[in-house]
């Protein structure tokens, strides 16, 4: 059986290869996954290091190749390769994470958590909860099913999913022209 990664692509050919299949208009930089460290990004083509003020849109807050992450790579691989539907199927890794998060990261006045796979989904779920709450309150007051508008920053990035894209400032109207506008 052939591996998905049988063909090696040289760092100098990354953008050309990606451009065959996707819109590859990102940075002129090839991320070196082995040599990048802490807050430093390394360009695989040149070896040049760059101080990272980007952190992959905030998803790499602990930096690159953090020693703790590397030391526990096997556990992270198990969790990543065997992703369960955490709302219905549980495992010890999930219980340990939730327990740690609950003890350290949750204030007593917010006793419950809801976990999703990213910022756009978090924003969308927050919007759904807010719409539901507001419409219910308006129905109780007898003013009907009102409550489907929100206030948001115009020049901000909110995500790349349905609701979030309709709030995200983008220069290409084809990306959102048939989405409801908030």
Language model features by range: what are they?
Residues 99-182:
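PLP-dependent aspartate aminotransferase-fold enzymes
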């Amino acid at each position: 059986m052939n591996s998905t990664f049988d063909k090696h692509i040289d760092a100098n050919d990354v953008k050309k290869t990606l451009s065959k299949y996707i819109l590859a208009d990102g940075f002129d930089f090839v991320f070196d996954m082995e040599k990048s460290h802490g807050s430093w990004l390394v360009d695989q083509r040149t070896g040049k290091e760059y101080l990272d003020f980007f952190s992959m849109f905030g998803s790499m807050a602990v930096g690159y190749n953090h020693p703790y992450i590397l030391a526990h790579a096997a556990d992270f691989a198990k969790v990543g390769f065997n992703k369960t539907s955490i709302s219905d199927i549980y495992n010890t890794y999930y219980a340990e994470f939730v327990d740690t998060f609950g003890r350290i990261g949750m204030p007593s006045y917010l006793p419950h958590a809801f976990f999703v796979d990213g910022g756009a989904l978090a924003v969308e779920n927050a919007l759904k909860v807010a719409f539901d709450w507001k419409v219910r309150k308006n129905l109780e007051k007898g003013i009907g099913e009102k409550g489907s508008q929100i206030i948001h920053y115009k020049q901000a990035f909110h995500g790349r999913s349905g609701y979030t894209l309709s709030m995200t400032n983008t220069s290409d109207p084809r990306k959102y022209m048939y989405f409801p506008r908030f």
